[in-house]
A protein has these predicted regions:
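Active-site rim/loop-helix segments in enzyme catalytic domains that contact anionic ligands
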Residues: 1-101
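Active-site adenylate/phosphate-handling loop in enzymes that bind or generate adenylated species
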Residues: 94-137
């Protein structure tokens, strides 16, 4: 049976840096992979607030990465860069995709990360994935 994998990152490029090689390994094994990005906005500098990449640039870069990595599905959650929440809304939105794709393995951020969006993504993932048998951080 193919594994049903979900990779969850707070921002565009987090997933590629964090587990791009793991995605390729799963795709080589014939697994189904869903890429989930918690943010769907421009990327901004956390100190100055200056826009680093527009929403369209981010979307285009993620779509290119998803195609190159061979992911089967791409999903964006509606949260803003620097404002990824850990609350009922974020958990329920992520849980909807976990159920939709019948996911049995998840990869996400490490709990000890210093980035606040990464921490919120970790917490949201752990709550939404409480019934998923394999969660790796």
């Amino acid at each position: 049976m193919k594994n049903r994998i979900m990779v969850i990152g707070a921002h565009p490029d987090d997933i590629e840096f964090g587990c791009g090689g793991t995605i390729v390994k799963h795709k080589t094994n014939g697994d189904f992979v869903v890429y989930v990005c918690m943010t769907n906005t421009e990327s901004v500098d956390g100190i100055t607030g200056n826009v680093l990449r527009t929403k369209d640039q981010n979307k285009s870069e993620v779509e290119s990465a998803v195609n190159k990595l061979g992911c089967d599905q791409l999903e964006f959650l509606p949260f803003k860069d620097l404002h990824v929440p850990f609350n009922f809304e974020s958990v329920s939105k992520l849980e909807k995709y976990i159920k939709k794709y019948n996911i049995n393995t998840i990869y996400t951020h490490w709990a000890g990360d210093a980035n606040q969006d990464h921490i919120s993504t970790f917490k949201t993932t752990m709550a939404a994935a409480r019934y998923v048998p394999n969660v790796y951080c």
